[in-house]
């Protein structure tokens, strides 16, 4: 799964997820893309689950790109522990997602195949998404 090799601090504050995303909101590599339409956090496990769902459906044809990286640590306290007594231990890594962010890109496959692959991938993600296509102008 995806995770940073080295970080300055083990724990981070959650922060606010407001506003839209300007950087990373256009297709850079492929012909088709999956774009987020709401804010949220996507964990490394969810990114990998969506990637596997896509690649299995297209039978490893064409090429896919993952445009997000989980660089924010999230923590969790153990089960049945009372509140307080400090912040929990680091549990995993997540990517902060704002509306407009391109999550995945795909090329070298037909339109219908890409659309269905992204639909299967979207079921694995906690944010609402839409299918986008490169404008040939």
Curated annotation (Swiss-Prot):
One of its GO terms (biological process) is translation. Coiled coil: none annotated. Part of the 50S ribosomal subunit. The keyword tRNA-binding applies. Residues 1-20 are annotated as: Disordered. GO terms for molecular function: rRNA binding; structural constituent of ribosome; tRNA binding. Gene3D superfamilies: Ribosomal protein L10e/L16 (3.90.1170.10). Binds 23S rRNA and is also seen to make contacts with the A and possibly P site tRNAs. Belongs to the universal ribosomal protein uL16 family. Transmembrane segments: none annotated. GO terms for cellular component: cytosolic large ribosomal subunit. Keywords: Ribonucleoprotein, Ribosomal protein, RNA-binding, rRNA-binding, tRNA-binding. The gene is rplP. This is Large ribosomal subunit protein uL16.
């Amino acid at each position: 799964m995806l995770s940073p090799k080295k970080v300055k601090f083990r724990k981070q504050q959650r922060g606010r997820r407001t506003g839209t995303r300007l950087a990373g909101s256009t297709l850079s590599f492929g012909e088709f893309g999956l774009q987020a339409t709401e804010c949220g956090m996507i964990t490394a496990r969810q990114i990998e689950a969506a990637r596997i769902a896509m690649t299995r459906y297209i039978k490893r044809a064409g090429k896919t790109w993952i445009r997000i990286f989980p660089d924010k640590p999230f923590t969790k306290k153990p089960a049945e522990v009372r509140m307080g007594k400090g912040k929990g231990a680091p549990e995993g890594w997540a990517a902060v997602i704002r509306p407009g962010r391109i999550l995945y890109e795909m090329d070298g496959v037909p339109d219908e195949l890409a659309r269905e692959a992204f639909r299967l991938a979207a079921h694995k993600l906690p944010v609402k998404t839409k299918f986008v296509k490169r404008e040939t102008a």
